[in-house]
Regions:
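Membrane-interfacial helix termini and adjacent extracytoplasmic/periplasmic loops
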Residues: 43-62, 120-158, 239
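Transmembrane-helix boundary motif in ABC transporter permease subunits
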Residues: 3, 77-109, 130, 284-290
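Membrane-embedded alpha-helices of multi-pass transport/permease systems
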Residues: 27-31, 83-91, 108, 119-122, ...
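Transmembrane alpha-helices
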Residues: 111, 164-168, 184, 190-228
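Interhelical loop and adjacent transmembrane-helix boundary motif
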Residues: 134, 139, 224-274
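Transmembrane alpha-helical segments of polytopic membrane transport and secretion proteins
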Residues: 1-19, 284-293
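Periplasmic/extracellular loop-to-transmembrane helix junction in inner-membrane transport proteins
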Residues: 2-9, 13, 34-78, 98-99, ...
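C-terminal transmembrane helix and the adjacent membrane-cytosol boundary/short C-terminal tail
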Residues: 169-177, 184, 254-293
């Protein structure tokens, strides 16, 4: 009996230490990125770095506004496309589809969610970019190469749809069947039950799923690097090229680091991305607590 108690205590202490180590690792990452960013922060005002649009490292101009705008445009467009599609797919597969259909869709979603991002990038380069250039852009502008915010948003949305559908399906499955049956027994239609019972009960989990998808979208590198155009400009529309922060880091780190402050500028870009993801997750936790109340 004493051995079992001791074993439980040791297991609890080990799990506690692992939890502390995980939190400490995040803190180390943040501190490390901040220290590496300190040279550029000591020479330029933070507000100027965030609001200037000129990116000319050779001339000592480090404006991060184009990269922040590009990241925001691609992420927002991807979520706007993926969220309604994923939600409707999950509702159909959970509430309406036959069990045999779900049997085949589940493995397919897992496969799509696990595909390397470079495959999505190649697909976007071969299909989405020419489609935007030849069929969409001519309706609104005189010329577009196709390497645009729209192409990046479409590719990113396709990447996160399998993830969102899988998460939504698991969340909907966890809603008690008793609640569904009680709603139906009171005369509600199936859609009314879904709208007023299932979706309302699943709201906290859905918020967490969207934040997870946002985090993946913000950190995506290879796919956006291949389809967004990588021009350091502030996009005026979805048919302009953009340069998200992950693409900036992947495209330039290891090159031109002899330029003064270039290494520090890229580390500051990484710190910005880290900060945005952390704030996003903390904000989602606050929203979840409010929703649960």
């Amino acid at each position: 009996m004493d051995y079992r108690i001791a074993k439980d205590k040791i297991a609890g202490q080990v799990m506690f230490l692992l939890t502390i180590a995980s939190i400490f690792l995040v803190i180390i990452m943040a501190v490390g990125l901040f220290i590496k960013s300190e040279p550029i922060l000591s020479q330029y005002h933070l507000w100027d770095l965030l609001t200037e649009s000129n990116w000319r490292p050779m001339e000592g101009k480090f404006g991060f506004l184009p990269f922040l705008a590009g990241t925001f445009w691609c992420t927002a467009l991807a979520i706007l496309i993926a969220l309604p599609i994923s939600l409707l797919m999950a509702i159909y597969l959970t509430e309406y589809a036959h069990r045999s259909i779900r049997k085949y869709v589940y493995p397919l979603l897992d496969i799509l969610a696990g595909l390397p991002s470079v495959i999505y990038g190649v697909w976007g380069t071969l299909l989405i970019v020419p489609w935007v250039s030849k069929h969409v852009a001519p309706l609104f502008v005189e010329f577009s190469s196709g390497y645009t915010v729209l192409a990046g948003g479409i590719v990113l949305s396709v990447m996160i749809i399998p993830l969102l559908v899988s998460l939504f399906m698991e969340i909907f499955d966890n809603v008690s069947k008793d609640l569904r049956e009680a709603s139906l027994s009171l005369g509600a239609t199936q859609w009314q039950t879904i709208k007023h019972v299932v979706l309302r009960k699943a709201r906290p989990g859905m918020i967490a799923a969207v934040v997870l998808a946002l985090s993946r979208t913000l950190g995506e590198t290879i796919a956006v690097l291949m389809v967004c155009g990588n021009l350091a400009i502030v996009p005026g529309s979805v048919l302009d090229a953009c340069y998200p922060i992950p693409a900036l880091i992947a495209n330039n780190y290891g090159e031109m680091l002899s330029v003064p402050l270039y290494d520090s500028a890229l580390m500051f870009a990484a710190f910005l991305l880290f900060f945005v993801v952390v704030i996003l997750n903390l904000g989602s936790r606050i929203v979840l607590l409010k929703v649960k109340e």
